[in-house]
A protein has these predicted regions:
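Positively charged, low-complexity terminal tracts
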Residues: 1-127
Length: 127
């Protein structure tokens, strides 16, 4: 699992299939959040990144891993791939979007003003 200094995060398991979700601390610089998200893909920790529009309840997955995986389970991202990810995440961070499959209690916290952004990375299912 990648570690970035000064970035608070925790690992939670929400789904019955054991998929791992990483919740990244909220009041961080946008580029650090973007870097963390695609770094999890580079290291093979994450299977995909999913954008969730909480207001409308819509999910839009950015699936990079399945097409990019190599035999050693690492992901080969080009500079263009990385720039695209940065832009997508930056655009989402600029708006009330969440990078995740959202858990209901996160909504209540957000609406109560306890957090204005949560970034999740969908991780690989633990064996």
């Amino acid at each position: 699992m990648p570690i970035i200094p000064k970035l608070e995060c925790r690992v939670d398991t929400f789904r019955e299939d054991g998929a791992v979700f990483m919740r990244i601390g909220i009041h961080q610089e946008e580029m650090l959040l973007a870097y963390y998200a695609f770094d999890t893909l580079l290291t093979g920790f994450a299977d995909k990144i999913a954008l969730h529009d909480h207001e409308n309840g819509a999910d839009c997955e950015i699936v990079l891993a399945p097409a990019k995986l190599t035999t050693d389970a690492q992901i080969s991202l080009t500079e263009n791939d990385i720039e695209c990810i940065k832009k997508l995440l930056h655009d989402c961070i600029e708006q009330p979007y969440y990078v995740s499959w959202l858990h209901d209690d996160l909504t209540a916290a957000t609406k109560a003003g306890e957090m204005d952004l949560a970034v999740y990375v969908v991780g690989k299912t633990e064996q």
